[in-house]
Every structure is written in structure tokens, then in C-alpha cells.
Amino acid sequence: MSDYKKTLQLPETKFPMKANLTQREPEMLRKWEKDDAYGAMVRASGQQGTYVLHDGPPYANGNIHMGHALNKILKDIIVKSRNLQGFKAEYVPGWDCHGLPIELKVEHELGEKKRTMPAHAVRKRCRQYAEKYLDIQRKEFKRLGVFGAWDKPYVTMHPSYEAATARELGNFAAKGGLVRSKKPIYWCCSCQTALAEAEVEYHDHTSPSVHVRFPLRDPRVAEVLPGVDPAHAYIVIWTTTPWTLPDNMAVAVHPDFDYVVVRHGGDFHIVAEGLLEACLKAFKWDEHEVVARIGGRALEGLKATHPFYDRPSPIVLADYVTLESGTGCVHTAPGHGREDYETGLRYGLDIYSPLTDEGRYLDCVEFFAGMTIFEANPKVIEKLREVGNLLAEGRITHSYPHCWRCKKPVIFRATTQWFIAMERNDLRQKALDAIRDDVRWIPSWGQERIHNMIEFRPDWCISRQRMWGVPIVALLCEDCGEAWNDADWMRDIAERFAKHATGCDYWYETDLSDIVPAGLRCPKCGGDHWKKETDILDVWFDSGTSFAAVVEQREECGFPADLYLEGSDQHRGWFHSSLLASIGTRGVPPYRSVLTHGYVVDGDGRKMSKSVGNVVAPQEIIDKHGAEVLRLWVASVDYREDIRISEEILNRLVDAYRRIRNTCRYLLGNISDLTPETMVPFEAMDPLDRFALDLASRAHERIQDAYTEYEFHKVFHTLHNLCVTDLSAFYLDILKDRLYSSAADSHARRSAQTALYRILMLMVRDMAPVLSFTAEEVFGYVPAALRPDVISVFALPATDAPAFTLDTTSRAAWEKLLAVRSETTKAIEPLRKSGEVGHSLDTHVTLFADPSLKATLEGLGSDLRAMFIVSRLEVMNLADAPADAWTSEELPELRVAVRKAEGEKCERCWIISADLGTDAAHPTLCPRCTAVLTGTGA
């Protein structure tokens, strides 16, 4: 017996079957660094224009987590795909370096020393801390295979950036949008600073619940409510913040609600009629009598008395009073609530909030001086009980605002702060118009979400009582407290920040005399004693002005950005602050499109938590599976919802990755001896090869469309389906005989090889944005003669949609052929089950078809037998089908007869033939294989 295996054209490639990603990826990173693959990618693009994805800066604190990995990989997929499509899309990564988390870490490190250190010394430590984690995170992001200008990132603590932020504040001042006033804002007593809306999280919290009566001793009560004795009249409120009662200034009722006077014992109590039953249940009053009804508007102006202080609490009107809970009469403390504050302004009430920064009552607060608000809660209740004005007491668990940093409950506290006024220059309406008209929101529900947030938000409190940030450039009169912040002067100071080695440290290191303009006098009192404002800017203003510091300034960018991409929480964060900052100073939004992704959760859909023990770190996955699997995970799911991750999910993706890799390896192995000179033009290819290339080209078009629409899960599924279904299970299975058994330089083999090469190059381009390491590795193993002369797969020039496509008529014919192939497989199955044949190659198939189908089948010529992977195939008229021929339910125009093929199996190609041994030198070979070996045929 001869060894005919050596005569076959078997696959040959050095591309390794085993990915060994954890070892190979670092090698690839070094290659990319050495070759400047990112620069090569950018230099090769630009034919389609520019595309700007502006990076939302992660906070320079700690190692990266799965949310960071998801976000950066998504951005990398977009940047790479846009460049490969011909857009010059450069990626400038950024870091958010100012703010409370870093300052608190440094505070902890410094301990008591911080109290005696000058501000610039503390800021230096904060800067060093941020630099440390910036470098750590940069390495971790690069390990993910993310391309970008890593050596030239934007950093919010860089002098040029700080100057831009201060300059934008000056621009707001110039337009009258910057104001300073005393208003209630979110305040964290633990961190001792104001908080923005975006810095507040809502969690369940258990609070005291009290019903309190306010004596109504106003003589006019008898006129408004005949029969009610003012000496025994009360109006009842309900609150979950007893500590705010010392600051009560009024009781609010709704002008359009009906109220009732309820007699219990000898006292009269006013509550809303719609809440009467709930109140009676809370008070545990079995016996009572409703003695009067009155509209809320009629109660306005009556003077109640504070429940434990000798001062009036007038009854006022407010539309925000509801009948959802309580009594319909609302305790009003203008120093501790936005709505209370607005009511206080309307009625001229005192905006009273006698608290220290750490939440302790000042000495002027009778009964509770020196107590924290939480210490005061039980003491207030005790006082109410003592004076006889506590009607009911309990506990309630409700959603309550907490500090995003320390996770402790926050309060509303009226303090003097700096604000961006939402109604000045029509900022709110302009922002709402831009949301509706000028921005594409992906997913679309993002539009309504941010619209509602902007529509109902208060003025933006931008001041913080901390050190680590951009200072609010303003002077305060030491004589009267008035602020001075001339816009031109503010912008001049900003330019000094830009020139200073450490940016806005200039504010802290420079003598006051060098900052105050000569001869400046207070416009309010005429004084000339000034001090610097010590508040810093909200970090959301800091990052929100990145469009001015980066998008407008960096030559590789352009305003407005094409895309902002962050987690869905940024509708209240960076998307929000960036929109207001840009609309406020430019009149237009800073972005054309906004794309959001969900949160990473565990395999059961639970939020990741250290306490639960379900946190998965990116580095763990990289160490076990490689970054490539993490990238594939990002592309495999619809990231616009919350994204699950687990070992089971990753293992499935490892299998999917292996199938894609093995397909690439097979394609590489079968083109090792192909050259540009031996390639076959598309028009001259065998029909099956043209169809396969058409399938791959259509998949390529779908993949490119999916990249354009940010639907990366469609990229993955299309690529995976191409490898598994169209190639491995169909085309490559059919092709093996032609590739292995045909003469090396035959048209049949070169046609197939050309198709495989074209398909491989489409696949490499399509997979590169997602499977970056593997695409580069595959590209490196493409035979040198066939590989484009570029240093990286990412430097491939953009091409139009490939012309390797069939017309609709040809496609329809192939769809019919595939259907016939499927039906034929069904017809063979009974013989396989019975053991009569072991493989489809053991069969002789006769297809009986009507004239139309018969013509389609015969049009494939010699490829037809190969396509069905049988040893012999005939096509005959449907009318000639024997009675026992298999009948197709799907194709009535087709019947199939299957029998065991006659003859012997060719030792070289394994096809059964009745004509073995036509050449005495090769007695076990079929005529085709004999012709190949003797050089007389293909």
C-alpha cells in the first residue's frame, strides 16, 4: 500500500492552535508599543473625516473594576472600528483627579497633622496620591488592549485644565449665570461639605415618625371657625425629621384641600379631611367628633405657635402639600428644604439653619445647643412629650438621601453657596430644547431621563468646603461679607493658573496683595479689606468643562464631540454637568450623541458587593482567561442593559473564542502556498466559492453596520455564526476534498484558496476592534506575499463595501440549493440510523426535481456532488421518481432516492468509485486522484 497522505495538500501554518492568551497578550502589547500601532492606525485613517469620542474621566483612586473595564473596552471597540472604516478617530484618555475621595484618603494618612498644614501642602499630597493611581490605572487600561494617547492624557489637575475650568467659571460670571446666595442644599455632616445632586444616593433609612400639634391661639380662629375655642385649638403636622422642628417657621396647607376640625376631649385639631382616617388611626382616637370643615385657603394667615418655643408659626399656602401621607399640614423649615425655602421667600420667613458644618446646633438653640442633629432627634421628641404636643410617635423605613462617598445620611441645610442659576439666560429651557432637538440618545429612553432631571432640578450648587479642587476665584469683603468676582479679573487669574507650575496652587501660594486689584473697594459697603474665597468648585463642574479644556483645545479633537459614552448613572452626572456647562457658555450641547451602558452584575443579576462576596475583578479574568475573553464578553451582550458575568458565562465565551480562532487557523493553513499571481478573480471562481465569499461579504456588511450603530453584540453573533454555521458546518466541510485532493495549482484549488484568503481578510478586519490581540496575531501569520504592507492590522486602509457579492437571482438559487441539501441530509438519515451507511460519502443520491429546480441544480455542475458530500449524485426529472423515493415536505418539487454507493473507497480521497485502478500503478485510486498524481488532470 502506498502512503498517499503525502500527496494531499493538507493545511500548513505555524499559527498556534492553543491561544495561550495570558502569555501572548503581554508580548503583543510590547509589539504594539514598539511599532506605535495606535499612531499607525490613526495615520492610515481620515478618508471619511474625523470622529471624536470624548472620554469621561474615571476617578484616579484605586484599581480599575469591571465597570471601568466594560467602559474602556466599549470605547476601544468604537475607536478602532471607526478608524478601520476610514474615520480619523483619536482617543484621548482622561482622569478626574480632584475631589473628596482623594482628600479624605490623604486626610486619613496625615491624621492630626493636616490641621496644622497649609492648604498648598495638603494639595501637594493629594496631587501625589492622584498621580500614583493614575499610573496604576493607565497600566491596567493598557493591559485590556485599549489604544489611545496614553502618554498624553488629559488630567483635571493639570495647570492647563485647571485654567480652563476657572476660565469657564469666569464665562458664567460674565453672562450673569454665577450667583452667591443662602439656600438649602444637600450637606454631608461627616464630610462637612455641600453636595451636588449627582453626589447623592438613595438608600433605605429608618427615621423617627412623629405627629405634632401646634397651638393655634390666634383670636381670629373664632371668626374663621365659629364654635372653636382658640385656647384649645391646634393644627397637626407629621415629620420624619424631628431635629428640624427647632427651625420651624410656618405650617403649610394646600389652598384647594378641605380640612376638618376634630374634637377629642376638650381640644380641637385641624387635619386634612382626606387623611382623617389615617390620622385617627395614628392617634389611636376611638372617640372623636368632626365639628367643622374649612378650605385650606381660608386658613392662610392664622398664626399658630411653635410647639415648644414662644414664637409664631403662621399658616401659609403651598401647592406641594399632598394627601399621600401625614396630615395635609406640613411643617415648614425654610433652612432645611427646597420647597420650604421657596415658601419662605414668598412669605418673608427667616431662612433659619443654626447648625455647624458637622451638624451640631449652635449655642443659640434653646434646649438642644451643642447636640448633633441625630442626638437631638430623641431630645426633641422628649420635649414635645413634656409640653404635651406629641400626638403620636413611631418609626418609618423610607428611601433617604445618603452621601455618595461616606454613605451616611445627608441633610438639607441653608448655607451661603455659589450656584449656577438655572433660570438666568434661560439655561434650563435651552438645555431642555437641546436634549430634544440636538442630541441623539442611545438608548432612546435616556432622553426622557435627563430631560426630567433638568426640568425639575434646582439651581446647581457648585461650591464645596474642601481644599482639593479648583478654587472659586472670588474675593470676600471682610467688613460685610459681600463677594466680588469680576469676570475679566477671574479670567486673568485663570491665565495665571495656566502659567503656574502646579496650576491653581497659585491661589493658595500667592499673597493676597498680588491677587486683589489695586484700589478695589467693596461695592456694597465701600470697605477695602478682602480675603480669598476658600471654597472650591464641585468636581462635576470640573469634569463637566472638559469640552472646553480638551475637545476645543486638543488638535486631535473637535467641538462638539461626536459621542459621550458612560454608564447610565451619568445622566445625573457627567452628561448632565457637561450639558449645563456647555449650554451656559456656548449655547449648544458639547456632544452630538450620548450612549449609555448598564452596570456589571453577577451571574444571578445581583449587584456586585464585597459584603456579598460576588465581586469579580478584571485582573482575575485576565490572569485566568486573558483580556481577549473579557473583550469578547463586552461584545457578546447588549451592554445597554445590566450585564451579567460569571465563570459559566466566561467559559461559554472561551468556547466561542476557540471556535473563531480555530476557523482562522484553518483558513491560514489552507492558503500557505497561495500567491497574488495564483489568485483567481471573483468572476472566474467556482460557483460555490463565489457563494461562500458572498456569505462572508454580507456578514461583513452586517458587522460594519453593527459597529456604526454601536450594536456590538450583533458583531459577535454575526462573526460567530459565520465561523460556525456558514464556514465550519457548510463551506469548509464541503471544501476539504477540493483543497486536499486536487492538484496544488489546479483552478479548483486556487479558486477555493482565493475565497478563503478573501474571507480571512474580511474576518480579520471585522474582528480586530473586538478581538484585537487575536486579529493582530492572525494578521501576522498571513503569508508574507499576501499580507498588506502595513505594520499592524489596525493600519489597514479603509475600503468600500467589498465587491465580492452575488446578484439577487444568484442568491435565490443558492438559497434553494441549500434547502435541497438540507432535505437530502434528511433523506440519508434513515440509512445512517439503520447502519447501512456510516457517512454521507457512502451514498449514491439521485435528486428528482421539476424543470425549474432541475435547471438550478444542474447549473452547479461538478460542484453539486461535492456540495452534498456524497460519492455519486444524479439529477433526474421529477416524473421519473420511483414510488419509494423520499418525499420532501418542505419542497414539493423535490424527491430523493438514496442507496449505498457502488464500488470501493479511494484510498486517497475516500470517495467511493466503481472505477478504481484505471492506472495499474495506482490500483486503489479513483480516476480523479490518479490524474492528479500522474499530472494529467486536476
UniProtKB/Swiss-Prot annotation:
ATP binds at residue 610. It catalyses: tRNA(Ile) + L-isoleucine + ATP = L-isoleucyl-tRNA(Ile) + AMP + diphosphate. This is Isoleucine--tRNA ligase. L-isoleucyl-5'-AMP binds at residue 566. Belongs to the class-I aminoacyl-tRNA synthetase family. IleS type 1 subfamily. The gene is ileS. GO terms for cellular component: cytosol. CDD domains: Anticodon_Ia_Ile_BEm, IleRS_core. Zn(2+) binds at residues 906, 909, 926, 929.
